[in-house]
Amino acid sequence: MNMTAFLLFLAIVGLTLIITYFAAKRTKTTSEFYTAGGGLTGVQNGLAIAGDYMSAASFLGIAGMIALYGFDGFFYSIGFLVAYLVVLYIVAEPLRNLGKYTMADMIAARFKEKKIRGVAALNTIAISTFYMIAQLVGAGALIKLLLGLDYTAAVLIVGVLMTIYVVFGGMIATSWVQIIKAVLLMAGTLVISIIVFSKFGFSLNTMFEQMKTATPLGADFLNPGNKYKVPLETLSLNLALVLGTAGLPHILIRFYTVKDAKTARTSVVSATWIIGVFYIMTVFLGFGAAAFVGFDAITAADQAGNMAAPLLAKALGGDFLFAFVSAIAFATILAVVTGLVLSAASAFAHDIYSQIIRKGEATEKEQMKAARWASVAVSVLSILLAIFAQSLNVAFLVALAFAVAASANLPLIVFTVFWKRFNASGALWGSLTGLISALVLVSMSPSVWDPAGGAIFTGDPLIPLSNPGIISIPLGFLGAWLGTVLSSDKTIDEDTFAEIQVKAHTGVHMEQE
């Protein structure tokens, strides 16, 4: 075991537990638990969004993909960044103005039917759980590699910590864990990027020229098609990334942590700059790993290339820099899973328990109790499923999370705000069509079926797309449209839609429910 890494891991755990202790003292109401009382500034929330969004897949996965596949690895990261243009121009302001705690609140501002809120809440729980299991499986494998801990023990450590942060600290603790993670990640990535760039004499021309001979791909390293050989697959994947982000519940609830829509927009702009700079720096990480660690050493440590960044740190700065990068990866995992637990728990406690079961009549104390127990339940379920999934290829869960978010959530968000004729039937059918089509298509994809036995089942996939976004997203919108136009309810509530338009874009009356 690398003792330096172990001590840095302990330091991060200690720091985050101290944050949780002070956050717990401030978390007395449901507003503070769900949204930190709306007290974050735009820059703070931007850092938290970046901390929530830049997962271990972003830090370790993309650096590894660039190191192994060059251009295709960087192109994969573009989808994550461009997604925030959709969030900025379509989602952030209406969501903040119409909702209160969850995504379902926004839909319920127009449609009062309990079944609509229930379906939206179940989508949130499903997306968060899929994503969380994938993160926990990755966490277990990563910590096992870095510290030599048993996989189950590693998952339990992360699981227990995320439960403590959410149950006791709520959104306040979650936000500050994410902010600290974002600062550490940016600092660590910047240091390594500068060192790598110095090795190339601070010359981009030199760097690109050397990369043509640094890998087995030769000059093709800088060209597309090394990993994604089917253009349709690339298009489908990036479509799901770009549109799926606008429907990810753990990202959406962050817009409730600020006081108004203007600050929500500032949050998105801040997050976009942070995320954009980060992904530019992953090029230096990937190129550096390819040049100074080498293809064989990277794949020997991890076939997918996830150890590229830590190995680069070790090559450049010895055990200390390796330990620092490993600790950042640990903080990255903690920040993301904490946000996922909170989004799933909020959907159950606020939408299902408080609004549907108790019909909005639950007391503040009852809501807080439900939220905390929901956090425990979500955490325990995810931990158990992650332990069970140790030997499985869980890449399909990430594809599924983004596909469901884009196919089931985004049609509801867009049509609720922008389509006058949209009705409850359309909302229900759009959500269900998107959810079911994403589930079915992913279950038939190469992420689940592989003739060589590299996926869950051995056999030929029924569809060639690992991420079915290019099919399931249009189906979600089509289901919402057909559900509306074929509905027996042909009435258009002009007054309600007019009020939604005013509230969505100005925030007028947004606190009056």
UniProtKB/Swiss-Prot annotation:
Keyword Chloroplast annotated: no
Location within or outside the cell: Cell membrane
Gene Ontology molecular function: acetate transmembrane transporter activity; symporter activity
Name of the protein in question: Uncharacterized symporter YwcA
Membrane topology qualifier: Multi-pass membrane protein
Domain of life: Bacteria
Any one of the GO CC terms: plasma membrane
InterPro entries attached to this UniProt entry: Na/Glc_symporter_sf (IPR038377), Na/solute_symporter (IPR001734), Na/solute_symporter_CS (IPR018212), Sodium:Solute_Symporter (IPR050277)
Stored Pfam families: SSF (PF00474)
Classification of source organism: Bacteria, Bacillati, Bacillota, Bacilli, Bacillales
Gene that produces this protein: ywcA
Family: Belongs to the sodium:solute symporter (SSF) (TC 2.A.21) family.
Main subcellular location: membrane
Keywords: Cell membrane, Ion transport, Membrane, Sodium, Sodium transport, Symport, Transmembrane, Transmembrane helix, Transport
Record has Repeat as a keyword: no
GO biological process: plasma membrane acetate transport; sodium ion transport
Regions that span the bilayer: 3-23, 47-67, 71-91, 129-149, 153-173, 177-197, 233-253, 273-293, 320-340, 374-394, 395-415, 424-444, 462-482
